[in-house]
């Protein structure tokens, strides 16, 4: 697709926003390279991936992509036999960990919803657990190899620790015995050797090797002769340590080389998943949907919103093309929102053809176009003025040179910038030429000649942007089938231009033009009323559908709660009955034992009788557990709002929130649920009191963007704990599986306070200190329930 249209329609700005949602630099690079696909298969495949990512984000939260970075160059170095540094190995570890976690993330129970596109990608991932564990065991940080990397390294470092301890003991003794010759009663290290600061004039009093001197020459750093052998031994151990570290790094690098192909494959898949989830996150921010993609030149964008206009300012628009007409002529005054319409249609098509979900209603469709041309002006934003006539014409000439059979062409002020009569004639000729080649066109203009052309020409339709004459502002709603008008006389009158001047101006217009403008005004008014009625009807229908759906869901939940409560109560009662039987049997058994000893035979007979009575009573109670006692209690003959009543079928007290209807049904509240029941099914409670009816707030699910990381550095422990508590609540409601709490290393006070709080927090399943790439000891990784 031509780069000019991508720039003019501001697709690059969309990609800059999209990049913010990508984690890795390699995924950001894929965003930079994103352009519309040239076939419907790739378009639909990419849209389905984006839609699956959106659904996964809403159901499972963010994927575990942390730690992923572009290690392509590192893998190439390993493949060539190079030795990797600890920092490079940790980056490889980050990719290996992300691979394992990502595959685990996509594991699901058989009954759970499947996401075939992304699950297939995750299935190809090949975790390399042995290499991951070995790097994790061997590398501590970007510049430190762990003692556990090898037995040899462990032994060398243990010897080093012992030697250093011996040297420190000896040098402390030397410092104490020679303190009068020293600048300071301490020791230091020069060139990996322990030395003491001797005053220059006492050089001969402290025998040893001079390693350095101060800038003034007043102090000499001398290695006492008694430490030379010990220092030599330490130096030898340090050389052995370095050699062993080099061997460990070389061995790990070799294993990376042996697994390089798997690593490259995993990196490619993870990068692709990172890219796809960035599209899902952006779609979530836009409240976007997956449109249907047609290949017949027909599209139907419903409630389409420009993604770069602020949410509280954007006005949704409905645009159709290709079915009843192939050219849409949008007329009306300047600054009326015509350019916004063009840019919205063009940008939403480019987004959809690039695999991005679009901000529109769920019944929207776009069409596959090989080219989208936009003659709106290179530097013109939505608020800027129009280009010149020559600039327009140059762009039009370039557009007409293409094969336009599968093209969407957007013209802003077609024929503008020159004599109105000539401009209108040129505009009609251009439309005729492009239409004959099979192009789909949307053009804006304020020429009356083009309105008349659209009225008389087949497959060409008028449209206008609604204008509020009271506020002198456009509403930006598109009215298809109604040509626009300039509203010059109405605007002049509202601003204060004299009536005699306006009447004089009207006299200079032909009677036909005045009648035509009047007809347009009537059409606009009727169209506006019809659109408003349609919108109101849709709102009412949507509300009715939502209420019906909520009622059905609540009824279903109520049935489940009722059944569960009944079964639990029955099981509990059965346990009580069984326990009572067991106790009676135990007592009887004890009496039998006493009888064998000749004690209490009369008591046994009485106990047997009592046991039988108890058994009969318990069996009768057990039978009654299976019956619903719906007739218990006195029937209510009348009710009042807020009255308490007993509903036997639920075994629960409810509150009456409506009077009986013509079917004898009342609405009651049972907990958070509202249900309708027959008045005759309600029973009086011990005190059927009238309570003030409390309106329950409806629970609505909002997918809000909760960050998976909170930074507490700089806060005191009390403030940090307060923020973490609120953040964990938000993260739990946002369905995040794992979050990162950054508290820094410092003195450890803040970390201890946070950990103490996490131990008893209701939403916390597990927590641990961060690993490499997760913040180390300066961060805590929390797994939520």
UniProtKB/Swiss-Prot annotation:
Enzyme class: hydrolase
Keywords of the record: ATP-binding, DNA-binding, Endonuclease, Hydrolase, Nuclease, Nucleotide-binding, RNA-binding, rRNA-binding
HAMAP family found in the cross-reference section: MutS2
EC number: 3.1.-.-, 3.6.4.-
Name of the protein in its database record: Endonuclease MutS2
A Pfam family the protein falls into: MutS_V
SUPFAM superfamilies, per the entry: DNA repair protein MutS, domain III, P-loop containing nucleoside triphosphate hydrolases, SMR domain-like
Native source species: Clostridium botulinum (strain Eklund 17B / Type B)
Lineage: superkingdom: Bacteria
Family affiliation: Belongs to the DNA mismatch repair MutS family. MutS2 subfamily.
GO BP: mismatch repair; negative regulation of DNA recombination; rescue of stalled ribosome
UniProt binding sites for ATP: 332-339
Keyword Amino-acid biosynthesis in record: no
């Amino acid at each position: 697709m031509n780069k000019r249209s991508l720039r003019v329609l501001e697709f690059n700005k969309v990609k800059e926003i999209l990049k913010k949602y990508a984690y890795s630099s390699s995924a950001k690079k894929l965003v930079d390279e994103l352009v519309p696909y040239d076939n419907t298969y790739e378009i639909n495949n990419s849209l389905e991936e984006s839609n699956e990512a959106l659904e996964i984000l809403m159901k499972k939260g963010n994927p575990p992509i942390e730690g992923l970075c572009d290690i392509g160059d590192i893998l190439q170095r390993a493949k060539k036999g190079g030795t990797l540094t600890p920092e490079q190995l940790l980056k490889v570890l980050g990719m290996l960990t992300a691979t394992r976690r990502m595959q685990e993330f996509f594991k699901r129970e058989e009954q759970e919803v499947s996401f075939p596109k992304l699950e297939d990608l995750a299935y190809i991932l090949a975790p390399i657990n042995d290499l991951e564990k070995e790097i994790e065991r061997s590398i501590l940080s970007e510049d430190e190899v762990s003692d556990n990397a090898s037995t040899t390294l462990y032994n060398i470092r243990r010897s080093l620790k012992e030697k250093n301890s011996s040297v420190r003991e000896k040098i402390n003794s030397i410092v104490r015995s020679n303190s009068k010759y020293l600048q300071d009663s301490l020791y230091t290290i020069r060139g990996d050797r322990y030395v003491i600061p001797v005053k220059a004039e006492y050089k001969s009093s402290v025998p040893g090797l001079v390693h350095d001197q101060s800038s003034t020459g007043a102090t000499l750093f001398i290695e006492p002769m008694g430490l030379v052998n010990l220092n030599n031994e330490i130096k030898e151990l340090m050389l052995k340590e370095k050699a062993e570290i080099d061997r460990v790094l070389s061995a790990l690098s070799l294993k990376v080389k042996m697994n390089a192909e798997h690593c490259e494959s995993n990196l490619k898949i993870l990068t692709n998943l990172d890219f796809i989830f960035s599209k899902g996150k952006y779609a979530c921010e836009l409240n976007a949907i997956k449109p249907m993609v047609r290949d017949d030149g027909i599209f139907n964008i419903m409630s389409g919103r420009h993604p770069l206009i602020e949410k509280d300012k954007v006005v949704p628009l409905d645009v159709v093309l290709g079915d009843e007409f192939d050219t849409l002529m949008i007329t009306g005054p300047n600054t009326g929102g015509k350019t916004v319409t063009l840019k919205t249609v063009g940008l939403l098509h480019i987004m959809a053809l690039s695999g991005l979900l679009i901000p529109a209603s769920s019944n929207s469709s776009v069409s596959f176009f090989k080219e989208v041309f936009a003659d709106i002006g290179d530097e013109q934003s939505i608020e800027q003025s129009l280009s010149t006539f020559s600039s327009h014409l140059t762009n039009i000439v370039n557009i007409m040179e293409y094969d336009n059979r599968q093209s969407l062409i957007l013209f802003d002020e077609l024929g503008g910038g020159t004599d109105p009569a000539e401009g209108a004639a040129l505009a009609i000729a251009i439309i005729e030429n492009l239409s004959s080649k099979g192009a789909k066109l949307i053009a804006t203009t304020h020429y009356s000649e083009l309105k008349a052309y659209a009225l008389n020409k087949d497959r060409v339709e008028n449209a206008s942007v609604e204008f509020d004459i009271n506020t002198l502002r456009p509403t930006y709603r598109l009215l298809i089938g109604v040509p626009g008008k300039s509203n010059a006389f109405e605007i002049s009158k509202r601003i204060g231009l004299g009536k005699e001047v306006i009447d004089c101006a009207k006299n200079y217009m032909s009677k036909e033009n005045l009648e035509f403008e009047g007809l347009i005004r009537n059409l606009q008014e009727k169209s506006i009323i019809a659109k408003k009625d349609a919108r109101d009807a849709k709102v009412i229908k949507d509300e009715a559908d939502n209420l019906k759906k909520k009622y059905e869901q609540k009824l279903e939940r109520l049935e489940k709660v009722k059944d569960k409560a009944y079964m639990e109560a029955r099981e509990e009662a059965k346990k009580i009955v069984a326990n009572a039987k067991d106790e009676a049997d135990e007592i009887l058994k004890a009496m039998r034992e006493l009888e064998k000893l000749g004690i209490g035979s009369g008591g046994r007979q009485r106990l047997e009788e009592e046991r039988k009575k108890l058994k009969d009573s318990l069996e009768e109670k057990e039978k009654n557990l299976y019956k619903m006692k719906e007739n218990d209690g006195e029937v209510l003959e009348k009710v009042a709002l807020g009255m308490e009543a007993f509903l036997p079928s639920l075994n629960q007290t409810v509150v009456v929130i409506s009077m009986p209807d013509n079917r004898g049904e009342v609405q009651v509240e049972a907990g958070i649920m509202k249900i309708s029941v027959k008045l005759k099914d309600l029973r009086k409670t011990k005190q059927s009191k009238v309570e003030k009816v409390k309106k329950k707030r409806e629970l609505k699910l909002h997918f809000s963007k909760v960050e998976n990381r909170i930074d507490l550095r700089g806060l005191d422990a009390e403030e940090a704990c307060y923020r973490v508590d609120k953040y964990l609540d938000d993260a739990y409601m946002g369905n995040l599986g794992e979050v990162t709490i950054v508290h820094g290393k410092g003195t450890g006070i803040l970390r201890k306070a946070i950990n103490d709080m996490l131990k008893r927090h209701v939403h916390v399943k597990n927590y641990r200190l961060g690993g490499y790439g997760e913040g180390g000891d300066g961060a805590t990784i929390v797994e939520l329930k």
